[in-house]
Amino acid sequence: MANLFDAPQFIEDAPSLAVNAESHTTATQPAVIFDDVGKVFANTRGVATAALANVTLNVARGEVFGIIGRSGAGKSTLLRLVNGLEKPSSGAVRVNGVSVGELDERGLVTLRRRIGMVFQHFNLLSAKTVRENIALPLKIAGVPKAAIEKKVDALLELVGLSAKRDAYPASLSGGQKQRVGIARALVTDPDILLCDEATSALDPETTQAILALLRDINQRLNLTVVLITHEMQVIREVCDTVAVIERGEVVETGPVWRVFGDPQHDATRALLRTLVHDLPTDLAERVKPLHDIAQADAQILLDVRFTGADAREPDLGGLASALSVEGGRVSFVHGGIDRIQGHAQGRLVVSAQVRANADSTVQAQIATLLERARRYANHVEVLGYV
């Protein structure tokens, strides 16, 4: 697979193009800064609606930064501020050290040549071949034909479509169309790649392949990627950092492993629900509240969570031994442990037997279970008993 660093940077041959972003900023400064950004839209009757409010974020150079939220949360508006398709009503958006809102039309053209865009619905020209679709931005910029051909060939190899260079979009699968879109976005050697729900129109298998391609491109080219999505699985697979947006405000942000392992906001927990190991219906129907417990022998269900904050791996064997109070049975009935960015995290539902005797009540044994479980996990609570 080709490395674009091996190909000449043909964008320099195009007329009226700006100096590289490195002249405006340093490699240690964020690629994108949202500084207390607000965006207000007014309808035809002059009624104002706040799409974004008080958004402050830093996107580090070379990272994959994910923005997630439900439909209408403000994700697309936030993304459009980066390339100047929208201007902030308040605050500032800085890209490579330049305030986007202060640029004139010529400055915006220059900015957009350093920012690639990948769309949800591909936006390919049906009457042009794969090669022609990818080459279009360079052709418009006046780059020599020989240079265009060489660059397009390198990109086709990078995205795995060399055999499709003369095919038309109608003959391509959804995943192949998106690969063309990615190649086209990279043809001007951008510093930043914006992805607007780039996988939401794809099947799960194709989605995985496109996400792997985006991560490969990010690592090969040290390219800053900003993507928006409503799918937590996309964030989990490809992002380094995530920001959760709800009703126009960023309610939570941080490394993906930390946000997934210990979500702090209800909106984040709601979005994560598709990935969380909830109790199966048959088990949930059998669980009784703890205050109803009367028998001297019961199976207590504990919700045991690992956030990934600890350097050590979860010691499940030690946990099982610790919960065997008075020799009672212990079993893991549901859940699992996953790894995100090198951090082991997850949720387990553990069944532990308690039996009252002359020396200890059921309530005392439950208290012992909780105390012991908390030595091994970050969060533990009693779900009830069966």
Curated annotation (Swiss-Prot):
Quote the EC number. Answer: 7.4.2.11
Gene3D superfamilies the UniProt entry points to: 3.30.70.260, P-loop containing nucleotide triphosphate hydrolases
- Main localization, broad class: membrane
A single GO cellular-component term from the record reads:
plasma membrane
State the SUPFAM superfamilies in the record: ACT-like, P-loop containing nucleoside triphosphate hydrolases
Q: Which reaction does it catalyse?
A: L-methionine(out) + ATP + H2O = L-methionine(in) + ADP + phosphate + H(+); D-methionine(out) + ATP + H2O = D-methionine(in) + ADP + phosphate + H(+)
Give start and end of each ABC transporter domain. Answer: 32-272
Q: How does it sit in the membrane?
A: Peripheral membrane protein
Annotated positions binding ATP: 69-76
Assembly, per entry:
The complex is composed of two ATP-binding proteins (MetN), two transmembrane proteins (MetI) and a solute-binding protein (MetQ).
User: Into which family does the record put it?
Assistant: Belongs to the ABC transporter superfamily. Methionine importer (TC 3.A.1.24) family.
| UniProt name for this protein | Methionine import ATP-binding protein MetN 2
